[in-house]
């Protein structure tokens, strides 16, 4: 009985730790009937900064062009594939993405290895979904 209880406690703590890795803050909540799911092609506006010093490394707003990609297909960092699920069009979220959900220890371009990333995101469109479905 004691081993069973300890096993259950360990699994609960492991789940808690894993779910705490990716920070998701809903900054503008929108109610809808159709939320994003794996496989959706989405259009996202975003602003990416380094948590360490707040410096901006990329932004779709400056280009006035949202990023289009297939959600959950591994075409973006893991923090986006997981952190942008269950969103409504018009919703805004701030994602705090640790290195293991971002670019890891290798980094890329202006993003150093081991960096925690902050993304301000806004869901602009889910392709193939009509306004009356939202």
UniProtKB/Swiss-Prot annotation:
It catalyses: [protein]-peptidylproline (omega=180) = [protein]-peptidylproline (omega=0). One of its GO terms (molecular function) is peptidyl-prolyl cis-trans isomerase activity. Residues 1-19 form the signal peptide. The keyword Signal applies. It is found in: Endoplasmic reticulum. Inhibited by both FK506 and rapamycin. Residues 39-127 form the PPIase FKBP-type domain. It comes from the Eukaryota. It holds the Pfam family FKBP_C. A motif (Prevents secretion from ER) lies at residues 131-134. One of its GO terms (biological process) is chaperone-mediated protein folding. Keywords: Endoplasmic reticulum, Isomerase, Rotamase, Signal. Its EC number is 5.2.1.8. It is an enzyme of class 5 (isomerase). The keyword Endoplasmic reticulum applies. GO terms for cellular component: endoplasmic reticulum. Belongs to the FKBP-type PPIase family. FKBP2 subfamily. PPIases accelerate the folding of proteins. It catalyzes the cis-trans isomerization of proline imidic peptide bonds in oligopeptides. This is FK506-binding protein 2. It comes from Aspergillus fumigatus (strain ATCC MYA-4609 / CBS 101355 / FGSC A1100 / Af293).
């Amino acid at each position: 009985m004691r081993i069973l209880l300890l096993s259950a406690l360990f699994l609960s703590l492991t789940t808690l730790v894993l779910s705490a890795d990716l920070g998701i803050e809903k900054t503008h909540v929108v109610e809808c009937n159709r939320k994003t799911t794996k496989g959706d092609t989405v259009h996202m506006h975003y602003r990416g900064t380094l948590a360490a010093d707040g410096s901006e490394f990329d932004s779709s707003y400056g280009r006035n062009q949202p990023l289009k990609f297939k959600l959950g297909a591994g075409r973006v960092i893991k923090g986006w594939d997981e952190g942008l699920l269950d969103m409504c069009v018009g919703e805004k979220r701030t994602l705090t993405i640790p290195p293991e959900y971002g670019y890891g220890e290798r980094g890329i371009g202006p993003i150093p290895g081991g960096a925690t990333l902050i993304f301000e995101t806004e869901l602009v469109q889910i392709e193939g979904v009509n306004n009356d479905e939202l």
